């Protein structure tokens, strides 16, 4: 199960966070800072994108200046989550046309809606790119 998702830039600024298990506000602030500290110091050439953290695993991937980090149960498949991150970024790229950090800042509600189409209650719900894009485009027409 996915516990939370963080998207942060290289400077540690949070661009999107989504929690599927309850955390106190103080805990959220603490874990955002701690996770950025852990991930940003790792060498991508020599270290994997998986990290044991407390009683969970952090699976992350860096795209340009953004870190996409998923915190999952320790029993979840690391590679499946890594592929889910890539799938999410592919959908963002298709929807926004070469997504950048500014797209996440000014269209955070759309990014959140895309994430809600893919992940339901901390579990992967939809894995068909075309289906997700059709639903998001239908929501766009309603605006």
Curated annotation (Swiss-Prot):
Chief location bin: membrane
Subcellular location per the Swiss-Prot or TrEMBL entry: Cell membrane; Membrane, Coated pit
GO biological process entries: clathrin-dependent endocytosis; intracellular protein transport; vesicle-mediated transport
Source organism, top-level taxon: Eukaryota
SUPFAM superfamilies: SNARE-like (SSF64356)
Record keywords, A-Z: Cell membrane, Coated pit, Endocytosis, Membrane, Protein transport, Transport
Record keyword Cytoplasm present: no
A molecular function (GO) term: clathrin adaptor activity
Topology class, membrane: Peripheral membrane protein
Any one Pfam family match given in the protein's UniProt record, by short name: Clat_adaptor_s
A GO term from the CC aspect: nucleus
Similarity remark: Belongs to the adaptor complexes small subunit family.
Subunit structure: Adaptor protein complex 2 (AP-2) is a heterotetramer composed of two large adaptins (alpha-type subunit apl3 and beta-type subunit apl1), a medium chain (mu-type subunit apm4) and a small adaptin (sigma-type subunit aps2).
Described function: Component of the adaptor complexes which link clathrin to receptors in coated vesicles. Clathrin-associated protein complexes are believed to interact with the cytoplasmic tails of membrane proteins, leading to their selection and concentration.
Protein name: AP-2 complex subunit sigma
Gene: aps2
């Amino acid at each position: 199960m996915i516990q939370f998702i963080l998207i942060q830039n290289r400077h540690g600024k949070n661009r999107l966070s989504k929690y599927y298990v309850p955390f106190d506000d103080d805990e959220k602030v603490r874990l955002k800072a701690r996770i950025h500290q852990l991930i940003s110091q790792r060498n991508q050439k020599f270290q994997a994108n998986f990290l044991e953290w407390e009683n969970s695993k952090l699976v992350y991937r860096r795209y340009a200046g953004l870190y996409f980090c998923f915190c999952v149960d320790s029993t979840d498949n690391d590679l499946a989550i890594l592929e889910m991150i890539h799938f999410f970024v592919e959908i963002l790229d298709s929807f926004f046309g070469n997504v950048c950090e500014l797209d996440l800042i000014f269209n955070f509600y759309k990014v959140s809606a895309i994430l809600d189409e893919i992940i339901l209650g901390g579990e992967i719900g939809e894995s068909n790119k075309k289906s997700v894009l059709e639903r998001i485009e239908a929501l766009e027409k309603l605006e």
